[in-house]
Structures are given as structure tokens and as C-alpha cells.
Amino acid sequence: MADLDLQRKMVSPKLHVTIPEPCKLSSVSSPISSSSSAACSAYELYLRLPELRNLWSSLYFPHWISEPVLKPALQALEITFRLILTVASDTRPYINRREWIRRLDSLTTSQIKIVAAICGDEDNYEENVSAAPVSNGWSSLSLLSEIATCRTSESVGQKILSTIENEMRWCKYTLGLGEPNLAGKPYLQYDAVCLPEELHSLKNNPYADHIENQENQMLYTSHQILESWIYVSVNLLYRIESRIEEGKFEKASSDVYLLERIWKLLSEIEDLHILMDPEDFLKVKKQLQIKSTFPNDAFCFRSKGLVEMAKMSKELRQKVPAVLEVEVDPTGGPRLQEAAMKLYSRKTEYEKIHLLQGMQAVESAAKRFFFGYQKLVAAMIGNAEANANRTVANHESYDSLTQVFMEPPYYPSLDAAKTFLGEFWSQL
């Protein structure tokens, strides 16, 4: 009866729904595109991304399905440990060391939570847990032990160990970084998975020898963390697509919410820039010759990985028909919208609702990232230079970042379904 009443309301002439018009943007094929090949190559060489990529993709445990996602996540965490030691050993008296440590503590906690969620996802697959490489020994190569014993970083190190113990309590193994392990669980073979020694051989960037500026190392290390998580996300997106195609909607939903958390994590990593000393940062920007090569060239689009992650996040919308199990109406009819309304109202396939909600959460998190990035760049280099890259001849022309976060909704059918459902309930 509820369905019939809902359908009557859908076609009722008394139902008036106002849907706002999308903001008009300049006519471009896509607002998300990489910078020039020269700028992207310079960015990759500065961060030593080809060498990092070899470490991210070196898979030694073929029966362990979590390795492509968990390995680069653990490597991002290990690079964060290196950044903590870099801040703790910084001799400049004028840096905001206390806030740096607070932010890095928060960033580390966020990463550990995501790592724990990835490990916890394995509990649904007994065969995968048995394939995880575990042992009875701790890591001997991770920098966390040094953080936990160094006088200037001991407190944050001990807190990180407690966080690992707390967050891994739902998993069948723990990380083996020196955490108490009160449950006596097996330890992940951290050194074999993460490869800390090989990872830290990349601690110096190509300009470290002739640029005497501490912010150079801060910039380099924070972007290595960023790129590691971007690599995690791309692998996660492939897994999401595969799980949707296989009809594993609950597992895909879990991955989609992980992706949302990683978009938020990227914002947290980028926000570290605001703690850099303004003059030292602008000096290293000049030393590294970081500048826009053409109008609308946002600095973040030099990361090909970020561009791929953003495009793949957007293209999740192509999976909506598969989730709703209907084909797109070639005439533009509301077939998807009606299927979504029925799904929301009946609630019998709640795992699909979770997945669709997660997809929209990813859209929101991605657009928030680019909006926040635009404001961060203005705060770091000044509005004059930041705005110089925008085309503002008229109100219908925006820079590439603005176009990203002002795009129309990625999921118009879901958006319309919720609009009509809201109007239906407001009429009762």
C-alpha cells in the first residue's frame, strides 16, 4: 500500500518540486585534467615517484588479496614516522613545533584507523586471513621504535603505540611495531610487507644537497605520504568496481566508505602546509621553481595519480544502473530515479542503500578536497598569485579547481529521487 501511495504522489498534480539549476561553467570537456607533461615529470622526479611506485607495486604474497591496498598504506604510515622525526630534530627556533606534533599525531591516528579498517575487512574472508603473512616477531626496521625512545618525540611515539593497540583490537593480527599486544595475537610481518629499509633509502629528494632549506624536506616528505595514499585509493577504486560487477554490494560499500575517509585524509595531509614558515616556504618555492606554466594550471593537477583518483571517483556514477539493476532510459526518462525511490522506501536491500550513500559521500569529500585546496594555496602563496591563474573575464568562466567543486551532482537520479521523496513526506 505504501508503494502504491508513493507512486500516486509521484504523479500527483499537487506535487510541486523546485530543483535548482546547476551553475553554468565554461565549456570544457572535463575540469579534471593533468598539467603539462613537463610539469608532471618534474613533480614525479622531485618526489622520486618512479622508485616509490616500484615499492608500492612489489607484491610478494600472491594469495593475500589485501596486499595491493595495505602495502602502500603501511608505507605511507612509515613515511609519516620519518616526518615526525624530521620535525622533532628541526633546529629552527621559530617553527610551531607543538602544533606540528599535534597535527602529525592526528594524521598518524587517521592513517592507523584506515589501516585497521583494511585489516578488519579481511575477517570476512577466512582464506584471506590465513594468507596474511604473520609471525611472532616485531619489526626491527620501522622508525616508530626510534620515535618512542627519542627524548623529543617519546610522548607521541608512546601514544601511537597505544593507538595501534586500540585500533587493531578487532583484527586477527596486529602490526608488530612494539604495541603491547595484550591479546597475544600474531604479528604482521611488517618489514617484509612495508620494506622500511628500501623506503627510507628514498628519504632525500634530488635537491637535498644544494637547497639548504628545511621546508624542502617537509614538502618532499608530506607529498610522498600524499602520493602513497593516492595509490591506495586507485587500487581501492578498482576493487570497488570489481565488487559491484560481482554483485558484492556490502563489500563494495565498505570500500566506498574507506575511499571517502582517504579523500578526507588527503585534506589533512595538505593542511600540513599551513604550518610551514611562510618565508622559508616561499623561498623553497622559488628554489624549486614551482610556478604555474599556463592559466588554470592548479598545482595539484601535476599529480597524475590524483587526477586519476578524481576521475575514477566521479566515474563510480556509471555503476548506479548495475546497483539498481535497471538500464538507463535512452529517452531520458526517470527510470533510474524511480528505481532509487523504490529502493529507498522498501529497505529490503539495505546494502545497496549503503553503497549508494557511500558513493555520494565520496563525491562530497572529493569536492571538499578541491575547495579546501584552492583556499590553502591562497593562504600559502597569497591571493594575488593564486588568483592570477584564474580566468575571471565573466561570471561564467572559472579556474579548473572551481569547476571541479561547482560541477552539477554526479548522481542526478539519486538527487532527484531524494528530492521527490522529501516532497512526498512533506505533503503528509
From Swiss-Prot:
Compartment(s): Cytoplasm
One GO biological process term: L-tryptophan catabolic process to kynurenine
Protein origin, superkingdom: Eukaryota
Protein's organism: Arabidopsis thaliana (Mouse-ear cress)
SUPFAM superfamilies noted in UniProt: Indolic compounds 2,3-dioxygenase-like
Keyword annotations from UniProtKB, A to Z: Cytoplasm, Plant defense
Cellular component terms per the entry's GO annotation: cytoplasm
Alphabetized GO MF terms: heme binding; metal ion binding
Protein name: Nematode resistance protein-like HSPRO1
Assembly and interaction partners: Interacts with SNF4.
Biological role stated in the UniProt entry: Positive regulator of basal resistance.
